């Protein structure tokens, strides 16, 4: 009698196991591939605190600070380079040559078979808070993302 109960429990266990195996093999029909137009956008890959991908606050010192912002391609990688242009916004209060200098001039080129490029900037000591605002203006068959086309450095003394 006890042996029959053990056999029945064993059989039920095997059936449950087989059902779980077949149920877990259901094909995922969710498509997560981006199908929209090719865009470029600023991305600030800050893995410690990824709060704001398009802004950064920097405390300046007497020694110039090297920093960067990242432009990424949204869409498939291309077999040829992708030219991207950017400009310093007229609303910037930081002065070129005094408060900052762009080590990477516009336009930049996203290399073939890659998804982005860094724009390097040198930030100098400021005596009052200043803002450096960079806008993406487009490029080689790409348009700037509406939400991530502006990057702002806030320079603090």
Protein language model features and the residues they cover:
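Bacterial N-terminal signal peptides that target proteins for export
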Residues: 2-14
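Short boundary segments that mark the start of a structured unit
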Residues: 26-157
């Amino acid at each position: 009698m006890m042996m029959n109960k053990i056999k029945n429990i064993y059989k039920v266990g095997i059936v449950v196991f087989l059902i779980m195996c077949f149920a877990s093999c259901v094909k995922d029909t969710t498509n997560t591939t981006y199908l929209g137009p090719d865009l470029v956008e600023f991305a600030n890959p800050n893995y410690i605190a990824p709060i704001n991908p398009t802004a950064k606050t920097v405390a300046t010192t007497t020694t110039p600070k090297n920093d960067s912002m990242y432009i990424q391609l949204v869409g498939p990688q291309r077999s040829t380079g992708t030219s991207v242009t950017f400009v310093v916004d007229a609303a910037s209060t930081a002065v070129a040559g005094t408060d900052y200098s762009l080590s990477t001039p516009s336009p930049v080129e996203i290399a073939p078979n890659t998804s982005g490029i860094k724009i390097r900037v040198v930030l100098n000591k400021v005596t009052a808070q200043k803002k450096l605002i960079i806008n993406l203006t487009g490029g080689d068959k790409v348009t700037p993302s509406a939400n991530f086309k502006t990057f702002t450095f806030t320079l603090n003394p």
